[in-house]
Amino acid sequence: MLKFLTPTAYASHHVTPATRFRSTPVKNLLFKQLTLLTGWNRSSYELGRRSFSSDLDSDTKSSTTTVSAKPHLDDCLTVIALPLPHKPLIPGFYMPIYVKDPKVLAALQESRRQQAPYAGAFLLKDDASSDSSSSSETENILEKLKGKELINRIHEVGTLAQISSIQGEQVILIGHRQLRITEMVSESEDPLTVKVDHLKDKPYDKDDDVIKATYFQVMSTLRDVLKTTSLWRDHVRTYTQACSLHIWHCLRHIGEFNYPKLADFGAGISGANKHQNQGVLEELDVHKRLELTLELVKKEVEINKIQESIAKAVEEKFSGDRRRIILKEQINAIKKELGGETDSKSALSEKFRGRIDPIKDKIPGHVLKVIEEELKKLQLLETSSSEFDVTCNYLDWLTVLPWGNFSDENFNVLRAEKILDEDHYGLSDVKERILEFIAVGGLRGTSQGKIICLSGPTGVGKTSIGRSIARALDRKFFRFSVGGLSDVAEIKGHRRTYIGAMPGKMVQCLKNVGTENPLVLIDEIDKLGVRGHHGDPASAMLELLDPEQNANFLDHYLDVPIDLSKVLFVCTANVTDTIPGPLLDRMEVITLSGYITDEKMHIARDYLEKTARRDCGIKPEQVDVSDAAFLSLIEHYCREAGVRNLQKQIEKIFRKIALKLVRKAASTEVPRISDDVTTDTEETKSLAKTDLESPETSAEGSTVLTDELATGDPTESTTEQSGEVAETVEKYMIDESNLSDYVGKPVFQEEKIYEQTPVGVVMGLAWTSMGGSTLYIETTFVEEGEGKGGLHITGRLGDVMKESAEIAHTVARRIMLEKEPENKLFANSKLHLHVPAGATPKDGPSAGCTMITSLLSLALKKPVRKDLAMTGEVTLTGRILAIGGVKEKTIAARRSQVKVIIFPEANRRDFDELARNVKEGLEVHFVDEYEQIFELAFGYDH
C-alpha cells in the first residue's frame, strides 16, 4: 500500500506544470501582485523554461524528461485511485508518497511507460473508530482497505495527479485539476481503478466588483503574511517561477484573470487542516472559493502575529538577561582591575571564612568538614545557577550558628529567689521546686539533663515563670508554641532540595539567641497536632526532649548533628492527659494549681494595678481602688484559677477613668476666640487676659485652682504645692458600691445558697478548670407506695457520676437497715436526686459520700450540721477513697464560709502541704469509712 510523508514534509516544496511563452508584456494582475511580493522578474524566464514544460501548449514540439506532453489531460477519464490520508493534493503543488504495494507500484510504472503518467489522488475519510492522529493506525487501515471498501472510504472529489517520477518506492505526484469519481472500473482489489469526470469552475464575470474586491483582499492578506513569514516567501518564489509562465500563456490565449489559481495557491500554502483544504478543492464557485481561501489566509495572519509576539518577547527576555550578565561580568572585571571588591563568589567565601576562622577550634570536626566541602563547591558553581543560591543559604546557616558560645550561668539561689518573688506572688511550692533545680545545677556546674513541664490552668503564669527562670539563670530566652502543630518540618526543618527550605525551630532558636545554652519555652505542648501525612510531631519531639538523644539532634536542613544537651527546655500545658505517654515520661511535671483569694488580692494590688495605671497614663494620686473593690472583683467577676481575667477587668476600670479625666480636662479648657474674629486689638487681648485670671491670687501672683470635678463618684480634692504654684488634683475612689459602674453587673453570685441546709440537701466540693467550687446535692420524695422504691437522677451528670449515685443509693439503704430497720423509706418511696446548675456538665466519683449523706438526711428527716462540706469517693462497702483537687476544693470552701470540711484519709498529706493561710480557720476531718462521716454530719446537738 501507500506510505505518505507528513504534511510538513510535502508542503515545503511545490511546483506546477509550466508552459513556454514568447516575449509578451506582463498584463495579468495576479502576476503583477506576485511579482511585487516576491521580486520575480523576466530574468527568471530562462530558469522557468529549463525547469518546466506545458502539456497545454499546442506549439510545443518537445518536452522535458520529467513530464511527458503527449497525452492530453482531458483524455484521462480512467485513472488509478490513490488514497491520501493526511492532506488533499492542491492543483499546482506536488506531493511525494511511498507506494509499498507491488501491484500498485507496477501499475504506476506501466502508466508512465505508456506515456499516460496520470493517477487520481483522493483524500481518505476519517474513521470514527480509529485515532486519526496515529500514523501506525493509518497504515493499518490502508493495508486492510481493498476495492469497494477503499472507494467507500475516499472522497469523491480529488485531484488529477501527474506521475512526475518514480524512484524505488517513492512516487512524486503533481496536481493539475479537480476530478470526481463516477464509478469503479476494476473488479479486482488491486489496484483500484475508477472512471472520473473532469470538473470545471462555474462561469463567472471577471469584471464583477465583488469578485475583484475579494481577490484584492486575498492579495493584501498574502502580502501581510509574506512580510512576517520567510517560508511563505519561498513558496511564492517557487510558485511564480512556474505558475506565472502558465498565466502568461493563458493571457495570450483567453485573456482573463486567473482567480482560481489564486484560490488554490492561498489554500495550498496555508496551514489549514485537511477538511478545510478539501472544502476549497470541492468548491467550483470561484467567488466562494476565494472567500474560503481568504478565511484560511486570515487565520494564518493571526497565527503568525501571535508567533511573532511570542518570539519577540522571548528574544527580549533573553537579550535582557544576556545584557545583565555581560554588564555584571564587566563590573566584576573593572573591580578586579582597580583592586577593589572581588567577585561575588570570593566575597561570599571570605564572609563565611571570616565567621568560622575565630571559632574554628570550637566547631565540631564533622561540621567543619562539611563547611570546607561546601566552600569548595561554591567556587565551582556559576552565580546564575539555582544551586549557587542553595549552597549560599546552607553555608550561611552553618556558619552563623553559635558554635561553642555559651552564656555564663548564675546559680545564686538568693538572687533567683528574689527574681521569682519580683515577678510572681505566691506559688511557693513551684518556686521551691525551681530553686531546688537551680541549686542542683550550681553543685553540678551545669543545669542540663532536665525537661521541666509546668502544668496548670490558663492565666496562672506558666509562660512568665519560664521567662523568670531564664532571667534568674542569666540565660537567653526563646519561646515557640506547638499548639496545633502537625508538620514535623517545623521542628526538624525541610530538606534542602525543596524550594524555600528552612531549618527547624531549634536551629532558628540558636541563630536568634546566639548561644548554645538558651532556655527554650515550648508552649501548649498538650495541644500538639496529631499524626498526619506531614509526619508525627510528637515523635519528633521525643528526639528533641530526650537528654540521651538531643546531644546529636539532626535537623533535616543542616543534615549535621547538633548538640542540644546544654539547652534547658521548659514546657507548658493546661492538662497532662493529652500529652503522649512517651513524651510525658521524659518530663518532670510541676503543677500550678492556681491562686487563692489572698494571693489574687496581693497580685492585683502590687502588680496588676500598677501596670494598668502606668499603661493608661494615670498618676497614683488620681485613683484609689479599695480592697473591698478588689475582693468583690475577684469573687463576683474573676473566679478562674489564674489572674488573666482579673487583669482585663482592672485595665477596664483604669481605661474608663482615663476617659473621664480627658473629658474633664477638655470641658475646663478656655474657649477659643471665634473664627469670625480676624484681628485682635490691644483692648481685646487685655480683656482676655483679665478673664483668664483666677478670682483668688496668691501674693506672688500665682493662680490657685479651686474648682472640683462634679461627678457621681465620691471624689476628694487635694492640693499639692510645687514651688509657688498650687494645683488641684481630683482623685477617683473605686469601692464595692460603684464597682458595677466600671465593670458591669456581677458575673457570679454567692455559691452559698442556704445559711442552714434543709433536710435532704448537703454541700459538696468540686473541681473545675476555673478552680474549685461548691456543689449542692438535693434529694426529695416523689411518691410513696408499697414496693415503689427507686431513684431518679437529674443535673446533666456523666456516666461516672450516675454510677456513684446508684452506689450511694445502695449504701444508704444498707445503712438505714442497720440504723433504723423499721424505716421503709427506700423500699416504698420513689426519690429524686438533683445536682443544681443543670446547664453545666458534671462528672466524677468524688460526690459519692455527699450523695449518701443527702439520701440519709431525707430518710432521717434531719438536716446535716451547719457550715459542713464534704468530698470523697465511696465504695459499696462504705470505704472512702482519695480524690483530687484538694487545694482548689479547700479554697472554694473558704470562699463559701464553710467551717468544717471532710476529706478522705488518703488526702491528708495533700492537705498538709497547703499553705498556712489556706488552711487557717478550717476544721478538717479525714475519714476512711462512711460511718465516720455519719457521726460528723448527724451526731450533733440541735
From Swiss-Prot:
Per its UniProt entry, what is the enzyme's top EC class, as one word?
A: hydrolase
Disulfide partners: none
The record's listing under Pfam families reads: AAA, Lon_C, Lon_lid, LON_substr_bdg
Membrane topology, record value = Peripheral membrane protein
The annotated active site, in chain numbering, is 846, 889
Q: What is its main location?
A: mitochondrion
Provide a GO CC annotation, any one.
chloroplast
Q: Key word ATP-binding present in the record?
A: yes
Chain positions recorded as ATP binding sites: 456-463
Write out the entry's keywords from A to Z: ATP-binding, Chloroplast, DNA-binding, Hydrolase, Membrane, Mitochondrion, Nucleotide-binding, Phosphoprotein, Plastid, Protease, Serine protease, Thylakoid
Q: Which stretches are tagged as biased composition: Basic and acidic residues?
A: 682-692
List each copy of the Lon proteolytic domain by range: 756-940
Which superkingdom does the taxonomy of this entry point to?
Eukaryota
Per UniProt, subcellular location reads as: Mitochondrion matrix; Plastid, Chloroplast thylakoid membrane
Record PTM Phosphoserine, positions in chain = 54
So what EC number does this one have? Answer: 3.4.21.53
Looking at the record, the residues that make up the Lon N-terminal domain are 79-301
This enzyme catalyses: Hydrolysis of proteins in presence of ATP
Family listed: Belongs to the peptidase S16 family.
Annotated function? ATP-dependent serine protease that mediates the selective degradation of misfolded, unassembled or oxidatively damaged polypeptides as well as certain short-lived regulatory proteins in the mitochondrial matrix. May also have a chaperone function in the assembly of inner membrane protein complexes. Participates in the regulation of mitochondrial gene expression and in the maintenance of the integrity of the mitochondrial genome. Binds to mitochondrial DNA in a site-specific manner.
Q: Partners and quaternary state?
A: Homohexamer or homoheptamer. Organized in a ring with a central cavity.
Report the NCBIfam families cross-referenced here. Answer: lon (TIGR00763)
| Name this polypeptide is given | Lon protease homolog 4, chloroplastic/mitochondrial
Origin organism lineage: Eukaryota, Viridiplantae, Streptophyta, Embryophyta, Tracheophyta
